[in-house]
Amino acid sequence: MKKRVTGIGGVFFKTKDPDKVKEWYNKHLGFNADDYGCSFWWKDIEGNDAMTQWSPFPENTDYFEPSKKDFMMNFRVENLDELLETLKKEGVQVIDKKESYEYGKFGWIVDLEGNKIELWEPVDQAFKQDEPDDK
């Protein structure tokens, strides 16, 4: 099996007012947030462009369910389907749902403390069309 997790794909958390939170982070920390939050670009060990997403969610979101927590981590993975099968065999709670978009494939698991974890097999190039070339 390839490497399981290759990095942090995103940090997602609930807030009372996502727009105000994005404004605060922009003003005080320089985040350039859009409707989805802020994308941080970096290079992986092979020198490929990679992205990590920071996203505040409304506090009434159901996206983090079945977890009751106010946050969710997203981890970048090399092979989502293979990893989910392996985790299922290891007894990990795998949420029976997968989604695919032009920017990657997603699956979800729940850790031993009830935290929902999003697993993302990214296609970082899909984001580059919207990003300036100076990053």
Could you tell me what each predicted segment is?
Residues 1-2, 61-64, 97:
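Short, flexible, glycine/charge-rich loop motifs used to bind or transfer phosphoryl groups or to couple energy/partner
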Residues 45, 106-107, 129, 133:
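Short Asp/Glu-rich motifs
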Residues 17-19, 67-68, 72-116:
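Vicinal oxygen chelate
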Residues 30-68, 109-112, 116-124:
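Conserved short beta-strand elements that form part of the metal-binding/catalytic scaffold
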Residues 40-41, 102-103, 129:
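Positions that flank functional sites
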Residues 2-6, 12-55, 89:
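Core segments of cupin and vicinal oxygen chelate
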Residues 51, 86, 120, 129-133:
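Short, charged, solvent-exposed linker or helix-capping segments at domain edges/interfaces
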Residues 1-22, 70-75, 123-135:
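N-terminal beta-strand motif that seeds the catalytic metal site of vicinal oxygen chelate
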